[in-house]
Amino acid sequence: GSSTSRFSAFAYAPWTAIRYGIDFLLRRPRHFLGHNPLGGTVVFILLGLVAAQGLLGLFSYDDHTDLHGGPLTSKVSEATVALATRWHIWLFDILLIVIALHILASFAYAIWKREDLIGPMITGRKRRKDFEDQPEAQIASPLMALLCLILAAAIVLGGITLAGGKIG
C-alpha cells in the first residue's frame, strides 16, 4: 500500500497516543499526513476485533440466518461452538461501537481542529502542512494491491479448505 497505509506509518507507542490525545484536547496543533498516534492505535484495535470476528465466525452457529454455521463448526464440540457464538455476537457489538467512535472522531477532528480528514481519505490528497510523520505520501502500485488482495483471499479460502471446512 501507500506509505501512509503501512503498519510502520501508524504504529506508535501507547504513551505517544496518550500524549497526542492530551494535545488534541488542549488544541495544540500537531499534523500528520497519515493516521495520528491515537487514530493509529484505534486502527490496530479495529484490525484485532475484525480478526477475532473472522476467527470466531469460523466456529459460530446462527440459526437466525440462512448461513447457519461457520465452515469449521463440525470440527469442534457443541460447547466450543456455543462459546464461539456468544463471543462472536458480543464482539460484533463492540466492533460497531469502536467503528462509530472512529467515525465520530473524524467529525470531531473537523469541528475541533477545523481539519478535513474524510475528504483526503476519499481523494487521496491532503493540503500540504508540516507533517510530523512524513513529508509526502508515496503511492503504491494498484496492480500490486490487487495481487495482494487475491493472495490474501487464496490464503483464507485455502486455509478453510485444508481444515476441512465447507465454503459456500
Residue ranges, per PLM feature:
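Membrane-embedded alpha-helical bundles that constitute the cytochrome b-like, heme-associated redox core
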Residues: 1-168
